[in-house]
Amino acid sequence: MPRSAPSLLLLCLLCLVACAGADGEAPSSPEDGDRPDPPAASNPRPAAFAFACGELALVAMPEDDLVQIRMPDRALTLPQVPAASGAKYQRGEVSFWSKGEEATLVLDGREYACRLVPDPFAEARGRGIVFRALGQEPGWVLDLEPATGLHLVYDYGEQEATVPFTVPVVGPGRTRIESGNGRDEVAVVIEPRFCADAMSGAPFPATVTVTVNGRTLQGCGARLVPGAPPGL
């Protein structure tokens, strides 16, 4: 990797590597709560939470009285049910019970103990980024922020492009954003299906394809805040 890669990209990759090893030293047990607290009071609450459940990885996305769960081989939508503590979601014999940084998943007759993966995007969320995607070989990071546009850093930081944010086009099973600035043309396709980072294995709720000036980049992404534009 070139030595000139920007600190943003390096920080992103280091955070994801940390996520992959989240089952090492156990964090202190938090008080029970409906959802994990944000890293700082000034930051909005995350829209998606990654959990490591032994050999399983999943992403949970709470929405009012239900949760969407994405895993490598399936996607689930579970309604919320009464619980003595935390937030419990259940449909039939399948349930997901979240208590702060820990959760219990019951699936296919098995019970899994889950632990929250540390949030690598707290700083970006605090800056107003609504969606972030990244990929490897070559390393790239894409930030979407309606007020400032789409900012893509790629080729390990050697290249970058910033184009205006345009209204996403939401279609069956995918969202597409196309924009340009007279020099760079960028198209982003977001598919709401489980994705694992190629370097760290960290789980994400979306698979992302970026095309910049005819060149295609593959990776994963996540909506960082609730209330983002439809399709993100």
Predicted region positions:
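Cysteine-centric segments in proteins
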Residues: G21-L232
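C-terminal motif of bacterial Sec signal peptides marking the signal peptidase cleavage site
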Residues: L16-A18
